[in-house]
From Swiss-Prot:
It comes from Escherichia coli. Belongs to the antirestriction protein family. Coiled coil: none annotated. This is Antirestriction protein KlcA. The lineage of its organism: Bacteria, Pseudomonadati, Pseudomonadota, Gammaproteobacteria, Enterobacterales. InterPro entries: Antirestrict, Antirestriction_sf. Signal peptide: none annotated. Keywords: Plasmid. Could be involved in overcoming restriction barriers during establishment after conjugative transfer. Pfam families: Antirestrict (PF03230).
Length: 142
């Protein structure tokens, strides 16, 4: 039997489900830290970022990400790898979420919660491969 892999899709979290999103994906103990890390990473990566409303997305493979509600493209600069480029707010949110997941998993290494975050990191990284800005996302997180 020939089965094709289904592409991973993202779904915007409805307003009524937003309260459940952070504890579901970061865990109840880490939800505040995880959310704050995503915002902090975008501030670190984008000098001109000065806050925004953030959308929450779930992925059909169990992953997730956050992305700011901004129309303009963001100039992203990653000191650690020399990446500099413009990304859409959606792609910048993916990058910020990946960095936040990596940092948070490292902070709690050796725990079941860290293992769950690592899985979610890989789910999101896999989703990014099909994103229209995949090449720039991968260069940013390299």
């Amino acid at each position: 039997m020939n089965t094709q892999d289904q592409p991973v899709t993202a779904s915007l979290v409805a307003e009524a489900q937003r309260l459940d999103f952070l504890p579901t994906y970061f865990g109840p103990r880490l939800m505040m830290r995880g959310e704050a890390l995503v915002y902090a990473w975008l501030r670190r990566l984008c000098e001109r970022y000065n806050g925004a409303y953030w959308h929450y997305y779930t992925l059909s493979d169990g992953g997730f990400y956050l992305a700011p509600d901004l129309a303009e493209r963001l100039e992203i600069e990653v000191d650690g790898n020399g990446f500099r480029g413009e990304l859409s707010a959606d792609a910048a949110g993916i990058v910020a979420t990946l960095f936040a997941l990596g940092q948070l998993a490292a902070e709690i290494a050796g725990t079941d919660a860290a293992d769950a975050l690592i899985d979610r990191y890989h789910f999101l990284r896999g989703f990014a491969a099909g994103h229209p800005e995949a090449a720039a996302i991968y260069r940013a997180i390299d």
